[in-house]
Design a protein with these regions (language model features):
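Tandem repeat scaffolds
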Residues: 1-169
């Protein structure tokens, strides 16, 4: 496995390619674009992503832990597939923050998102089924077509949510 620690990656673009066997620790990604990319047997720990775009990724054996995303467009990411079951059960998340991100059609199935702040995110078409969302904030979010089946949404933080036609299951 090739390792990168504390490196900066800027404006890297990959479409329809495969990234395999890479370890990224405390790396910074700025302005990077991944479209229809297969990411296999990679690990991202403590990385920061700024102004990046990821569309329709395919993950196989990928682990992500405690990463930060700022002003990113992350479409079709299955966040629940980026952690092993043991870490999920312990309440770990692949991300620490999703600041001002577009998260259209993302999957957050079964994640412990208690108290997480999604404020101002575009969550159109996202799936939050089976999550712990107690005290999570969805203030000023776009929620059109978002699914919240089998969740505890109390107390709901949906103040100012836009296009709030969403499904509670």
């Amino acid at each position: 496995m090739k390792e990168y620690c504390g490196e900066t990656f800027s404006k890297i673009e990959r479409t329809g390619e495969e990234l395999s066997g890479l370890l990224f620790e405390d790396c910074l990604f700025t302005g990077c674009r991944l479209t229809d990319t297969l990411v296999r047997s990679c690990r991202f720990t403590g990385c920061r992503f700024e102004n990046c775009k990821v569309a329709a990724p395919k993950f196989q054996g990928v682990q992500m832990l405690s990463c930060d995303f700022d002003h990113c467009d992350l479409s079709g990411v299955d966040w629940s597939a980026l952690m092993d079951q043991r870490k999920l059960e312990m309440g770990f998340l692949p991300f620490d923050s999703l600041q001002d991100c577009s998260l259209r059609h993302c999957v957050f199935f079964g994640l412990d998102l208690k108290g997480f702040d999604f404020s101002k995110a575009d969550l159109s078409g996202a799936v939050f089924d089976g999550c712990n969302l107690k005290g999570a904030s969805f203030a000023q979010c776009r929620l059109q077509g978002t699914s919240f089946a089998q969740n505890d949404l109390s107390p709901g933080g949906f103040r100012g949510a836009a296009e709030d036609f969403f499904s509670l299951g």
